[in-house]
Each structure stands twice: as C-alpha cells, then as structure tokens.
Amino acid sequence: MISPNRQGIVVWLTSLKYARQLRRFGHVQYVSKKMKYVVFYCDQSKVPELVDKLSSFHFVTDVKPSMRPFINTEYEGAKPDKAKEYDYKLGI
C-alpha cells in the first residue's frame, strides 16, 4: 500500500534501455514495453523538482505527475436507484 505522502509519476521514454536509470529517482512500479513508459513513485515534496529534472534528459519525451492525491474519493449524496435497490434485496 502506498503511503499518503507518495505520488506517482509517468515518464515516456524514447527507448526502454534507459528505464533502469529511473530507479535512482524513486520506486519503479511498472514498465510498459509496448508504449515505452515507466510508472514510479516518489515523495510528494520532490515531485516538482523531479518533473523538471526528468524533462531535461535526452531520452525522455514526456513527464506527467499523477493527480490521484488531489482527487476527492469520498462522495456525498450518492444514492442507488430505487429499482436497483429493490433487485439487490431480492437477490436477483
């Protein structure tokens, strides 16, 4: 499980042979061979610096930080439909 002070960064590369170099910036979670991108996690306080630093490398085409820590996942007033609620009670 990821602690709340971590944030994901997606880095698109020109070649996957440079993917190993990204391990020094954070915890590499996933490497896509087909689409040539790497997902890794680092401390949230270091994200702006890392985005600038990673963008300056010659093998990086694009860098995007994850917005998941800033999205509210607790919804208010979300009620299911009455018809679905009735079906759930019947076990259909």
UniProtKB/Swiss-Prot annotation:
Chloroplast is among the record's keywords: no
Presence of keyword Cytoplasm: yes
GO-annotated cellular components: cytoplasm
InterPro entries: DUF2129
Domain of life: Bacteria
Keywords associated with the record: Cytoplasm
Subcellular location: Cytoplasm
Residues making up the signal peptide according to the UniProt record: none
One Pfam family this sequence matches: DUF2129
Predominant subcellular localization, coarse grouping: cytoplasm
Family membership noted in the UniProt record: Belongs to the UPF0298 family.
Protein name in the entry: UPF0298 protein ABC2380
Native source organism of the sequence: Shouchella clausii (strain KSM-K16) (Alkalihalobacillus clausii)
Top-level taxonomy: Bacteria, Bacillati, Bacillota, Bacilli, Bacillales
